Amino acid sequence: MVLAAAMSQDADPSGPEQPDRVACSVPGARASPAPSGPRGMQQPPPPPQPPPPPQAGLPQIIQNAAKLLDKNPFSVSNPNPLLPSPASLQLAQLQAQLTLHRLKLAQTAVTNNTAAATVLNQVLSKVAMSQPLFNQLRHPSVITGPHGHAGVPQHAAAIPSTRFPSNAIAFSPPSQTRGPGPSMNLPNQPPSAMVMHPFTGVMPQTPGQPAVILGIGKTGPAPATAGFYEYGKASSGQTYGPETDGQPGFLPSSASTSGSVTYEGHYSHTGQDGQAAFSKDFYGPNSQGSHVASGFPAEQAGGLKSEVGPLLQGTNSQWESPHGFSGQSKPDLTAGPMWPPPHNQPYELYDPEEPTSDRTPPSFGGRLNNSKQGFIGAGRRAKEDQALLSVRPLQAHELNDFHGVAPLHLPHICSICDKKVFDLKDWELHVKGKLHAQKCLVFSENAGIRCILGSAEGTLCASPNSTAVYNPAGNEDYASNLGTSYVPIPARSFTQSSPTFPLASVGTTFAQRKGAGRVVHICNLPEGSCTENDVINLGLPFGKVTNYILMKSTNQAFLEMAYTEAAQAMVQYYQEKSAVINGEKLLIRMSKRYKELQLKKPGKAVAAIIQDIHSQRERDMFREADRYGPERPRSRSPVSRSLSPRSHTPSFTSCSSSHSPPGPSRADWGNGRDSWEHSPYARREEERDPAPWRDNGDDKRDRMDPWAHDRKHHPRQLDKAELDERPEGGRPHREKYPRSGSPNLPHSVSSYKSREDGYYRKEPKAKSDKYLKQQQDAPGRSRRKDEARLRESRHPHPDDSGKEDGLGPKVTRAPEGAKAKQNEKNKTKRTDRDQEGADDRKENTMAENEAGKEEQEGMEESPQSVGRQEKEAEFSDPENTRTKKEQDWESESEAEGESWYPTNMEELVTVDEVGEEEDFIVEPDIPELEEIVPIDQKDKICPETCLCVTTTLDLDLAQDFPKEGVKAVGNGAAEISLKSPRELPSASTSCPSDMDVEMPGLNLDAERKPAESETGLSLEDSDCYEKEAKGVESSDVHPAPTVQQMSSPKPAEERARQPSPFVDDCKTRGTPEDGACEGSPLEEKASPPIETDLQNQACQEVLTPENSRYVEMKSLEVRSPEYTEVELKQPLSLPSWEPEDVFSELSIPLGVEFVVPRTGFYCKLCGLFYTSEETAKMSHCRSAVHYRNLQKYLSQLAEEGLKETEGADSPRPEDSGIVPRFERKKL
């Protein structure tokens, strides 16, 4: 103790040391690395790279450990290194906490705090490496050495030989992503650096010995120098050395020499901030009672800090700072609880019924009451430590049980508790229960559970001695499995039980795991070939799937796992090994928005479906065992079986990003489980009676009587054939397995298929009838239809490059009538799915249809009308085609959905937040996701539309009109983007998703533009013209009109009017861009067919008329890229998307006068409706489309535009007036 104190004092003289100490007291005060914040308690300024959140915890932890050492009989002054003292136990606890902290850091700050995570791993690994390390720490010389280990010369007196040999193990710098604990890069460490040999009883070591370097003080960047990251070196912000006082003997002068590397630093990598460092008080006399200080709160959870404060009894500010450092980014790691020195508190076991921030019971009762009592009696700790010393590596199954990983087979006997669990629910309850938590705690203490440094990121427990296991992925999520909550202040949370996460999840999941959410976001699903079974099977290998949402329209899915750990493990696994369905690589990540899924209208009990799938899976396993015997276990990959090779139908690229590399064939990724899909036997078994699936007894029966499956499934085999044909027929989603995975379906898959077939057939008929009616309503429509077909044939790709694979064939398969039917069907479905906006949209759509019909009639009256009708026919047909395509895949997805849910997607889409998520779908921040988002075009919800919007914006910048379209698309049209990819190729390939859609629409508009400008002006044209005139007079700043149009639930008539204004605009523009800008109006013009489509789409669209417009835009997109783009902009611009639709490129709203209040706010110039005046005038009027329209009108029809604006309310008269003007100007 004296030595430590003296050394700490020595260190104190050094300026940096003292500041570090202060930093420890005042997190972030001393930490030169700003990131340290509270964590940077002892970080010397020289290395300012501490990963802010993670490192704070470590330094404090280190300080706490130092204090404990000082106070402990075996502290610095007591050279009892071989004897596990309470201090060593506490150090072990600190180590565990550090590990936990690192895990959390890894989880939350893998990107920003990679260094910190690495440091934590290293530090924890080092600490865990050996009890001797703790003993060394306790030993005065040891303590001294540690202080300077970070390359800071340590007090020579203290540990002259403790300097870390240059060859000492160096942990990757905090900046590195937690590499394996020992990096063996110690060479960087100055000889003075104290190397803590994992197994050395005393700090001094031969330089040649690889030793754990305590240079944790290094913050952040610490070169991969040494063992503990010389954290002090790296960022030295973490070093507690400056706070030599706080680090009594820990890194007295050495620490100060290091400037940042202090013994405290040892624990806290610079990345972590110096807070983790042990304060001198903790170890030195100053630490009176500070040894009680909480080990090292991993997070600056704030609460933890407060808790830690109480823990520090006579703790000096440094110690307080350490508890404060708990505030690091991970509340889970609480400073206080880390080292419960006193017996004051028995382990407080996690009460599964008691809410915890981490969904996991405190690790092994790690939760301490406010962590004040968090430290367990030193005696108890010592015992624990001793137990820890005898480390027995856990078996894989033991680790899984320890971490609460859902068992693959049930019933399951918990190897930790010897309790038999019969189902996942019971397992979940058991894992969260006190018994399991206690057993895990005891087990961890006795067995010294240590995670193998299998993952650079995370196994913290490098040393058998230290049980402090690095919970690889468990931070918060895995903690729940362990039944320990990291977030609470369980000082012990970090404890041996810390290895809450299965090692498998240790690496990649960290970045994903920012929360304890159980929802996994799956993007890039094959458009037509992904079934619920496929999605659910992705998660089954990792545990129970409690809920899911399959959004076929967006090619996205959300899986809710029973445990956060399972979700994280799943994400991590698939990050390492991409999941592939039908050759499409899936983007799987933790949902950033949803912690759990709540279906507004679960069509069928998800539990039942999932149970069926589980049963099926088990059954498959049994069956395989029977058929293949022991050799069956092909791949250990948890996903091997879960990956559903069932997607047989060709994947539709609309959902998958064009960028996603082709995935292995289903057979490949199926891991030879082709038998599932291709094996009639397997399929029959799968599709066997759903009821048997649900019962495990049935599984047994199946095993006993495998032929029963065949007998049962013979009819289903036929169904299988039907299904196979069906996907080919345009219902790829309805693969033979769409339902096979869901034994729920009371009706056999075949019956379901038959129903679907009947339904679709009926739908097409109804749609055909409706379409015919529309054509009848507008004589020119037939011609338009023909043109649309031609255009379809010409622009199949523009229509939807992404969909082309599946949609093109669909279009080919289905006649225009069928397309119309599908449009109607989609409309119906959408209406069902999107009940909220369905009524409004229907009304709007109806109005639009009527208006469109009227306009068409008007057009028939005039050549322009005829031209417009032609265009409309084209648009309508393409729109129908596109709608049909969309419906095809939607119906497919719905067909799948129907298997599980009612036919209406309405039930399917229904995470209360899913709409939001899809709207923002920031979750998949990947271009693929953007592309995926567009798939949701029909669905009002495009979680990833935001991404699409962003991409779209960029692409739009490339082209003004495309830009505008993209803006609209970005918001509301993102959904269309995927569909329009085909069109996009024709228009512009710059934007794979949104741009594509917009571009195609623009191109089509351009193509039609001549006709439209010449003849295609309908009544709506007048409105559009007025708008344009207004826009011209004002400015052409109306990107938002599209959004407004979408947003506003204006009647379809108005929309119909809008299209003509767009047509006028197109004419006025006379350029493809103009056409594109006005494409949406034109599309609207083609109101009878288009509007019908729009109605369907509107019904489909959750949004109101905007959605219908959006649908309409889609149709138009099919008809013409430019045209579609405009229209897409309008409908795509959803109210929620409006702000996003607006591009800040154009900062000044111009032509605001063109925005007139109607049902919503309608831009006469651009023919767009907006629900929000602000959006219309501020956002839309800044849009490139609006600007262009304004320019053209200002230059060509400024005067006329004003007049027309006055008469904009009367669509036909205005259209009549506007059309000539447009024609003139365009001509």
From Swiss-Prot:
A zinc finger (Matrin-type) spans 1161-1192. Changing residue 1120 to A: In A10 mutant; does not affect nuclear localization. Keywords: Cardiomyopathy, Cytoplasm, Disease variant, Metal-binding, mRNA processing, mRNA splicing, Nucleus, Phosphoprotein, RNA-binding, Zinc, Zinc-finger. It comes from the Eukaryota. Gene3D superfamilies: 3.30.70.330. This is RNA-binding protein 20. Residues 1-58, 289-374, 624-906, 977-1089, 1201-1227 are annotated as: Disordered. Changing residue 914 to A: In CMD1DD; impaired mRNA splicing of target mRNAs; does not affect nuclear localization. A zinc finger (U1-type) spans 409-443. Changing residue 1210 to A: In A10 mutant; does not affect nuclear localization. Changing residue 1080 to D: In D10 mutant; mimics phosphorylation; does not prevent nuclear localization but induces increased localization to cytoplasmic ribonucleoprotein granules. Residues 628-655 are annotated as: RS. RNA-binding protein that acts as a regulator of mRNA splicing of a subset of genes encoding key structural proteins involved in cardiac development, such as TTN (Titin), CACNA1C, CAMK2D or PDLIM5/ENH. Acts as a repressor of mRNA splicing: specifically binds the 5'UCUU-3' motif that is predominantly found within intronic sequences of pre-mRNAs, leading to the exclusion of specific exons in target transcripts. RBM20-mediated exon skipping is hormone-dependent and is essential for TTN isoform transition in both cardiac and skeletal muscles. Residues 518-593 form the RRM domain. Residues 624-634, 674-709, 716-738, 753-772, 784-807, 816-856, 868-888, 1024-1036, 1201-1215 have a biased composition (Basic and acidic residues). The modification Phosphoserine is found at residues 498, 635, 637, 640, 642, 660, 679, 742, 801, 865, 876, 891, 893, 977, 980, 1013, 1048, 1060, 1080, 1115, 1120, 1210. It comes from Homo sapiens (Human). Phosphorylation regulates the subcellular localization. Phosphorylation of Ser-635 and Ser-637 in the RS (arginine/serine-rich) region promotes nuclear localization of the protein. In contrast, phosphorylation of the C-terminal disordered region promotes localization to cytoplasmic ribonucleoprotein granules. Changing residue 905 to K: In CMD1DD; uncertain significance. Changing residue 259 to V: In CMD1DD; uncertain significance.
